[in-house]
Amino acid sequence: FLPIPRPILLGLL
């Protein structure tokens, strides 16, 4: 996942 467009996804993981 790209940390720029979807920073929320990284937080969930």
Curated annotation (Swiss-Prot):
Tell me the Gene Ontology biological-process terms attached to this UniProt entry: defense response to bacterium; defense response to fungus; innate immune response; killing of cells of another organism
Positions carrying Leucine amide are 13
State any GO CC term.
extracellular region
Keyword annotations of the record = Amidation, Antibiotic, Antimicrobial, Fungicide, G-protein coupled receptor impairing toxin, Immunity, Innate immunity, Mast cell degranulation, Secreted, Toxin
* Tissue expression remark: Expressed by the venom gland.
The main place the protein resides is: secreted
Annotated family: Belongs to the MCD family. Crabrolin subfamily.
What is this protein called in UniProt? Answer: Vespid chemotactic peptide 5f
Say which species the protein is native to: Vespa magnifica
Lineage in the entry? Eukaryota, Metazoa, Ecdysozoa, Arthropoda, Hexapoda
